[in-house]
């Protein structure tokens, strides 16, 4: 099979997943956008967390041109990405019981805030405990996961539960277990993951909804502009001064 044919198949698969998310997740997307708008309007703060490659979608929300300035990354050292050596350390830390409690205790997250937790499988201790503990603090949790994992894998948390079981709102990415969209007779393993594409788009749909909801209420959404357009830095400086008490990535 030609390389171009495989490229087309992957793009078709990704487009198909995006269409499913658009059609089947419309209700939770609207609910999540409304929750974020409510939180912004009520003086709450916004946080996003993801481990490993799930962190990419979280990072895409933070200090982002066209995004809400109030979204902060809840970072866990060694877990955020593949910048640690060995890269497998992050996967091991995701399975450590009690880590989420230590992270939340040392973070500015408090009652009335929103925490977006992204975990494709939703089966490891860190995202499960992060959601459980955050809700116990009075934090609203939006979980982004593939619900299919709950029926096709075993939870790695002592409770036997998954991220989806401890969220106020669940966004289902519809990614198949294994996160690989293509197979080929001449290649032993499935390949071409689409979770980052879909999860990132899903969350940007939520943020767009939040911005529109705020505008409908007569509230200017605290959006950032690109620093690479004229006037962008001045605009961002104004927004950050106005909302500085809710922005933690400048401290």
Swiss-Prot record:
Pfam families: SIS_2. InterPro entries: RpiR-like_SIS, SIS_dom, SIS_dom_sf, SIS_GmhA/DiaA_subfam, UPF0309. It comes from the Bacteria. SUPFAM superfamilies: SIS domain. Residues 36-220 form the SIS domain. GO terms for molecular function: carbohydrate derivative binding. PROSITE patterns: SIS (PS51464). Disulfide bonds: none annotated. One of its GO terms (biological process) is carbohydrate derivative metabolic process. Belongs to the UPF0309 family. PANTHER family: PHOSPHOHEPTOSE ISOMERASE, SEDOHEPTULOSE 7-PHOSPHATE ISOMERASE / DNAA INITIATOR-ASSOCIATING FACTOR FOR REPLICATION INITIATION. This is UPF0309 protein SAV_3856. It comes from Streptomyces avermitilis (strain ATCC 31267 / DSM 46492 / JCM 5070 / NBRC 14893 / NCIMB 12804 / NRRL 8165 / MA-4680).
